[in-house]
Regions:
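Histidine/lysine/aspartate-rich catalytic loop segments that bind and position anionic ligands
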Residues: 115, 123-140
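Active-site beta-loop-alpha junctions enriched in small/polar residues
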Residues: 9-10, 82-84, 110-112, 125, ...
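Active-site-proximal beta-strand elements of phosphoester/diester hydrolases
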Residues: 2-10, 117-126, 158-161
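Short active-site segment of divalent metal-dependent hydrolases/proteases
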Residues: 11, 54-55, 165, 188
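Core catalytic region of metal-dependent phosphoesterases/phosphodiesterases
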Residues: 2, 15-115, 171-176
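Active-site glycine-centered loops adjacent to acidic/histidine catalytic or metal-binding residues
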Residues: 8, 51-52, 81-82, 162, ...
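His/acidic metal-ligating clusters that form di-metal
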Residues: 32-46, 132-192
Length: 192
Protein backbone atom coordinates (compact mmCIF):
# COMPACT_ATOMS: atom_id res chain seq x y z
CA UNK A 1 0.00 0.00 0.00
CA UNK A 2 1.22 3.50 -0.85
CA UNK A 3 0.27 6.98 0.34
CA UNK A 4 0.15 9.89 -2.10
CA UNK A 5 -0.66 13.58 -1.72
CA UNK A 6 -2.10 16.04 -4.21
CA UNK A 7 -3.77 19.36 -3.50
CA UNK A 8 -5.75 22.05 -5.24
CA UNK A 9 -7.86 19.96 -7.59
CA UNK A 10 -10.32 22.87 -7.88
CA UNK A 11 -13.05 20.68 -9.35
CA UNK A 12 -16.16 22.44 -10.66
CA UNK A 13 -18.46 19.88 -12.26
CA UNK A 14 -21.57 21.68 -10.91
CA UNK A 15 -20.27 25.24 -10.73
CA UNK A 16 -19.28 27.55 -13.56
CA UNK A 17 -15.69 28.14 -12.55
CA UNK A 18 -13.45 26.57 -15.21
CA UNK A 19 -9.76 26.42 -14.38
CA UNK A 20 -8.66 26.95 -17.99
CA UNK A 21 -8.98 30.70 -17.45
CA UNK A 22 -5.68 30.33 -15.56
CA UNK A 23 -3.85 29.04 -18.62
CA UNK A 24 -3.65 26.24 -21.16
CA UNK A 25 -2.16 23.81 -18.63
CA UNK A 26 -5.62 23.54 -17.06
CA UNK A 27 -7.48 22.63 -20.26
CA UNK A 28 -8.92 19.15 -19.84
CA UNK A 29 -7.07 18.63 -16.58
CA UNK A 30 -9.90 16.55 -15.08
CA UNK A 31 -9.44 13.87 -17.75
CA UNK A 32 -5.64 13.94 -17.41
CA UNK A 33 -5.93 13.76 -13.62
CA UNK A 34 -8.34 10.81 -13.86
CA UNK A 35 -6.12 8.86 -16.24
CA UNK A 36 -2.90 9.48 -14.31
CA UNK A 37 -4.58 8.79 -10.96
CA UNK A 38 -6.06 5.48 -12.08
CA UNK A 39 -2.73 4.41 -13.59
CA UNK A 40 -0.81 5.27 -10.41
CA UNK A 41 -3.06 4.85 -7.37
CA UNK A 42 -4.22 1.34 -6.53
CA UNK A 43 -7.52 0.61 -4.72
CA UNK A 44 -5.66 -0.22 -1.49
CA UNK A 45 -3.66 3.07 -1.53
CA UNK A 46 -4.49 6.32 0.24
CA UNK A 47 -4.35 9.87 -1.10
CA UNK A 48 -4.08 12.94 1.12
CA UNK A 49 -5.74 16.00 -0.44
CA UNK A 50 -4.56 19.12 1.44
CA UNK A 51 -7.30 21.51 0.42
CA UNK A 52 -9.04 23.30 -2.42
CA UNK A 53 -10.74 20.18 -3.69
CA UNK A 54 -13.87 21.92 -5.08
CA UNK A 55 -14.96 25.39 -6.18
CA UNK A 56 -18.49 24.75 -4.87
CA UNK A 57 -19.90 27.31 -2.45
CA UNK A 58 -22.23 24.85 -0.71
CA UNK A 59 -21.97 21.14 0.01
CA UNK A 60 -24.96 20.28 -2.21
CA UNK A 61 -23.19 22.04 -5.10
CA UNK A 62 -20.20 19.70 -4.68
CA UNK A 63 -22.05 16.39 -5.26
CA UNK A 64 -20.58 15.82 -8.73
CA UNK A 65 -17.10 16.77 -7.53
CA UNK A 66 -17.40 14.20 -4.73
CA UNK A 67 -18.79 11.65 -7.21
CA UNK A 68 -15.72 12.16 -9.41
CA UNK A 69 -13.41 11.84 -6.39
CA UNK A 70 -15.23 8.76 -5.09
CA UNK A 71 -14.75 7.13 -8.51
CA UNK A 72 -10.99 7.43 -8.28
CA UNK A 73 -8.91 4.59 -6.84
CA UNK A 74 -7.92 4.60 -3.18
CA UNK A 75 -9.07 6.10 0.06
CA UNK A 76 -9.11 9.90 -0.04
CA UNK A 77 -8.52 12.08 3.03
CA UNK A 78 -9.52 15.73 2.57
CA UNK A 79 -8.28 18.74 4.50
CA UNK A 80 -9.92 22.16 4.20
CA UNK A 81 -8.33 24.72 1.89
CA UNK A 82 -8.90 28.46 1.57
CA UNK A 83 -11.37 27.96 -1.32
CA UNK A 84 -13.37 25.08 0.20
CA UNK A 85 -16.38 27.27 1.01
CA UNK A 86 -18.63 24.19 0.89
CA UNK A 87 -16.95 22.85 4.06
CA UNK A 88 -19.46 22.23 6.87
CA UNK A 89 -19.27 20.56 10.26
CA UNK A 90 -17.72 17.12 10.17
CA UNK A 91 -21.07 15.61 11.21
CA UNK A 92 -22.86 17.21 8.24
CA UNK A 93 -20.10 16.25 5.82
CA UNK A 94 -20.04 12.63 7.02
CA UNK A 95 -23.84 12.47 6.68
CA UNK A 96 -23.50 13.87 3.14
CA UNK A 97 -20.96 11.16 2.26
CA UNK A 98 -23.20 8.41 3.64
CA UNK A 99 -26.38 9.71 1.95
CA UNK A 100 -24.60 9.81 -1.41
CA UNK A 101 -22.80 6.48 -1.08
CA UNK A 102 -19.33 8.05 -1.14
CA UNK A 103 -17.55 5.35 0.81
CA UNK A 104 -13.85 6.02 0.28
CA UNK A 105 -13.57 9.65 1.44
CA UNK A 106 -12.71 10.94 4.93
CA UNK A 107 -12.05 14.37 6.43
CA UNK A 108 -8.97 15.46 8.36
CA UNK A 109 -10.42 18.04 10.77
CA UNK A 110 -9.58 18.08 14.49
CA UNK A 111 -8.60 14.41 14.17
CA UNK A 112 -5.82 12.24 12.80
CA UNK A 113 -5.40 9.11 10.71
CA UNK A 114 -3.01 6.20 10.98
CA UNK A 115 -2.14 4.58 7.66
CA UNK A 116 0.26 1.64 7.55
CA UNK A 117 1.92 2.71 10.79
CA UNK A 118 2.29 6.38 9.82
CA UNK A 119 0.24 9.11 11.52
CA UNK A 120 -1.27 12.04 9.63
CA UNK A 121 -2.45 15.13 11.51
CA UNK A 122 -3.02 18.66 10.37
CA UNK A 123 -5.03 21.81 9.85
CA UNK A 124 -5.57 24.36 7.10
CA UNK A 125 -2.91 26.74 8.42
CA UNK A 126 -2.80 30.39 7.45
CA UNK A 127 -1.15 32.99 5.25
CA UNK A 128 0.89 35.19 7.58
CA UNK A 129 0.41 38.18 5.28
CA UNK A 130 -3.38 37.98 5.64
CA UNK A 131 -4.02 36.25 8.98
CA UNK A 132 -4.76 38.06 12.20
CA UNK A 133 -3.97 36.74 15.67
CA UNK A 134 -7.39 35.11 16.02
CA UNK A 135 -6.92 33.00 12.87
CA UNK A 136 -3.35 32.07 13.81
CA UNK A 137 -4.46 30.97 17.30
CA UNK A 138 -7.37 28.98 15.84
CA UNK A 139 -5.08 27.08 13.50
CA UNK A 140 -2.52 26.44 16.26
CA UNK A 141 -5.32 25.03 18.44
CA UNK A 142 -6.65 22.84 15.62
CA UNK A 143 -3.18 21.48 14.89
CA UNK A 144 -2.71 20.70 18.57
CA UNK A 145 -6.10 18.92 18.76
CA UNK A 146 -5.27 16.93 15.63
CA UNK A 147 -1.87 15.91 16.99
CA UNK A 148 -3.25 15.03 20.44
CA UNK A 149 -5.76 12.65 18.81
CA UNK A 150 -2.88 10.41 17.67
CA UNK A 151 -2.85 7.17 19.63
CA UNK A 152 0.69 5.97 18.91
CA UNK A 153 2.88 9.05 19.20
CA UNK A 154 6.06 6.97 18.89
CA UNK A 155 5.21 6.18 15.25
CA UNK A 156 6.30 8.45 12.40
CA UNK A 157 3.97 11.43 11.94
CA UNK A 158 3.48 13.56 8.84
CA UNK A 159 1.81 16.95 9.17
CA UNK A 160 -0.75 18.04 6.57
CA UNK A 161 -1.54 21.70 5.87
CA UNK A 162 -3.18 23.63 3.07
CA UNK A 163 -0.93 26.67 3.38
CA UNK A 164 2.83 26.16 3.61
CA UNK A 165 3.49 26.06 7.37
CA UNK A 166 4.48 29.33 9.01
CA UNK A 167 6.79 29.72 11.98
CA UNK A 168 4.32 28.89 14.79
CA UNK A 169 3.31 25.63 13.09
CA UNK A 170 6.95 24.83 12.28
CA UNK A 171 7.80 25.27 15.98
CA UNK A 172 4.97 22.91 16.88
CA UNK A 173 6.18 20.35 14.35
CA UNK A 174 9.63 20.47 15.96
CA UNK A 175 8.11 20.16 19.44
CA UNK A 176 6.10 17.11 18.29
CA UNK A 177 9.12 15.56 16.50
CA UNK A 178 7.34 15.78 13.15
CA UNK A 179 10.04 15.76 10.50
CA UNK A 180 7.97 16.15 7.34
CA UNK A 181 4.79 17.67 6.03
CA UNK A 182 2.72 17.95 2.89
CA UNK A 183 0.82 21.04 1.86
CA UNK A 184 -1.08 22.52 -1.07
CA UNK A 185 -2.01 26.09 -2.01
CA UNK A 186 1.00 26.69 -4.29
CA UNK A 187 0.01 25.85 -7.85
CA UNK A 188 3.51 26.14 -9.22
CA UNK A 189 6.87 27.60 -8.48
CA UNK A 190 8.67 30.12 -10.60
CA UNK A 191 12.34 30.93 -10.28
CA UNK A 192 13.10 34.60 -9.85
Amino acid sequence: MAVYAIGDLHLSFQTDKPMDIFGPGWIGYEETLYENWQNTVKPQDSVIIPGDFSWAMYLDEAVEDFRYLNGLNGRKILLKGNHDYWWETKTKMNRFLKENGFNNIDFLHNNSFEIEGVNFCGTKGYDSKEADEKIINREITRFSISYESIRNKSARTIAVFHYPPEKELLYMMAEYNIESCVFGHLHGLEKS
